């Protein structure tokens, strides 16, 4: 799923990074994809829940534009259509090292275990 999501977000006009790709000062808004793991479901032995987090970063001194960018990311994920929202609104925090505002958007999907169908 990671590769499909990465490509879809990039095609949607977003700057996207994965683990270890971005460690510099934030000069442009971007999304960091983090695969948050897989867990068993209580409702079915055949399903597992895969979680993914999107960390949304926006440069300092442009706070008034952060919410619009977050909405752009959320709308792009809706168009992707393979993930379900798994969060209430998280606070917008400050990353002084990257000189950016950031927040987290969590999503998940249910997938069949191998041999589970």
Q: What spans do the regions from the language model cover?
A:
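Oligomerization/assembly interface segments of phage tail-like spikes and tubes
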Residues: 46-60, 101-112
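Acidic-leaning, charged glycine-interspersed low-complexity segments
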Residues: 71-117
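Small/polar-rich, solvent-exposed N-terminal microdomains that initiate assembly or binding
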Residues: 1-44, 68-72, 80
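Short, solvent-exposed beta-strand/turn "edge" segments of beta-rich domains on protein surfaces
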Residues: 41-47, 96-98
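Short, charged, low-hydrophobicity "junction" segments
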Residues: 3-9, 55-57, 86
């Amino acid at each position: 799923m990671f590769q499909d999501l990465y490509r879809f977000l990039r095609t949607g006009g977003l700057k996207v990074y994965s683990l270890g790709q971005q460690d510099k000062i934030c000069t442009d808004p971007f999304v960091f994809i983090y695969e948050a793991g897989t867990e068993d479901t209580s409702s079915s032995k055949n399903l597992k829940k895969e979680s993914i987090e999107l960390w949304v970063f926006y440069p300092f001194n442009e706070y008034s534009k952060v919410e619009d960018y977050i909405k752009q990311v959320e709308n792009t994920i809706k168009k992707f259509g393979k993930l379900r929202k798994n969060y209430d609104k998280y606070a917008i925090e400050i990353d002084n090292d990257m000189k950016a505002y950031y927040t987290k958007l969590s999503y998940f999907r249910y997938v069949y275990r191998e041999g589970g169908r």
